[in-house]
């Protein structure tokens, strides 16, 4: 994994996030909070363990994992998923699986920004973060 992912990132733009949350099955009240949040994402690495912590005024989440190894995750909207993160062509690719559903979250670096593409079925959301 590129060390350029490491550090603190702040959300600067978000496109189609509400539609993505709807596709995930997130309720209206939680979607409203999610749309208001401007989360900070802190990515760190210790040995071969990567940690991604997401902080917002409404909820904080944290996942720690080894690339390619499945782990249990409780998402910000309280889904219990089996998740796996891999590295391919410089992109951190996360797959979350639960109750027969699957969503992907791809994090890549573009012009010094972290571009996060979230996909559920045919709904795609793009969120852009800048390093703090």
UniProtKB/Swiss-Prot annotation:
Positions with a binding annotation for (9Z)-octadecenoate: 107, 127-129
Disulphide linkage map: 118-125
Modified residues (N-acetylserine): 2
GO terms of molecular function: cholesterol binding; fatty acid binding
Keywords: Acetylation, Cytoplasm, Disulfide bond, Lipid-binding, Transport
Keyword Transport: yes
Amino acids binding hexadecanoate: 107, 127-129
GO annotations of cellular component type: cytosol; myelin sheath; nucleus
Protein's GO biological process: fatty acid transport; membrane organization
PROSITE patterns linked: FABP
InterPro entries: Calycin, Fatty_acid-bd, ILBP, Lipocln_cytosolic_FA-bd_dom, Myelin_P2
One Pfam family recorded for the sequence: Lipocalin
Record localization: Cytoplasm
CDD domains: FABP8
UniProt keyword annotation of Transport present: yes
SUPFAM superfamilies to which the protein is assigned, alphabetical: Lipocalins (SSF50814)
Function: May play a role in lipid transport protein in Schwann cells. May bind cholesterol.
Note: P2 protein and myelin basic protein together constitute a major fraction of peripheral nervous system myelin protein.
Domains (record comment): Forms a beta-barrel structure that accommodates hydrophobic ligands in its interior.
Family, as annotated: Belongs to the calycin superfamily. Fatty-acid binding protein (FABP) family.
Subunit organization: Monomer.
Protein name, UniProt field: Myelin P2 protein
Taxonomic source organism: Bos taurus (Bovine)
